UniProtKB/Swiss-Prot annotation:
PANTHER family referenced in this protein's UniProt entry, alphabetically: REGULATORY PROTEIN RECX FAMILY PROTEIN
UniProt entry keywords in alphabetical sequence: Cytoplasm
One Pfam short name: RecX_HTH1
InterPro entries, per database record: RecX_HTH_1st, RecX_HTH_2nd, RecX_HTH_3rd, Regulatory_RecX, WH-like_DNA-bd_sf
Physiological role: Modulates RecA activity.
Entry protein name: Regulatory protein RecX
Species this protein is from: Klebsiella pneumoniae subsp. pneumoniae (strain ATCC 700721 / MGH 78578)
Entries under Gene3D superfamilies matching the protein: Winged helix-like DNA-binding domain superfamily/Winged helix DNA-binding domain
Main location: cytoplasm
Subcellular location: Cytoplasm
Amino acid sequence: MTEPSSRRSGYARLLDRAIRILAMRDHSEQELRRKLVAPVMSKNGPEALDVTPDELEQVVAWCIENRYLDDNRFVGQFIASRSRKGYGPARIRQELSQKGIARQVVDQAMRECDIDWVSLAREQAQRKYGEPLPSAFTEKVKVQRFLLYRGYLMEDIQEIWRNFAD
C-alpha cells in the first residue's frame, strides 16, 4: 500500500520528482536543481514543495552517484542534437553556458565531437538560399548574417566560399 504524498518524506517526494524529470531527457545539474525547487502543478494550482537545501543536495548526489545525472553525457547529447538542428559551435557554447555547464566541460566536448562545422554551415546556407550560393556582395552578407545568427564562426563561414567553388 502506498502512502499519500502528504505523508511521504520530502526526500522521497523530491527523489521521485527528480527521477521523473530525468526519465524524459538528460538535464544539466543546474537545470535539475531549478526544476526540483520550482512549484509543481496540482489540482489546486501551483504548489510549492517544502525542499530543504540538505534534501536537495542528497537527491542531486544520489542522481549523480547512480548515473541518472551526468553533465558530460548531457553535453555530448546536447551538442549532437543542436548540431543536427543546424546550429553552430558559438550558439551551442552559449546555450550550454546558460544551462550552467562549466566552460572546461564544454571545451572538452567540443574538441571531442566529430562535426565538420564548415560543411554543416554550407548545408544550412544551401537549405535557406539554394544552390549555388550567391556570389554578389549584398547576398553574401545576408548568408553570412544568417549563419552568424545560427552560431557559426566567421572563419567557417568564409571557408564556404574558399573551399567550395560554385
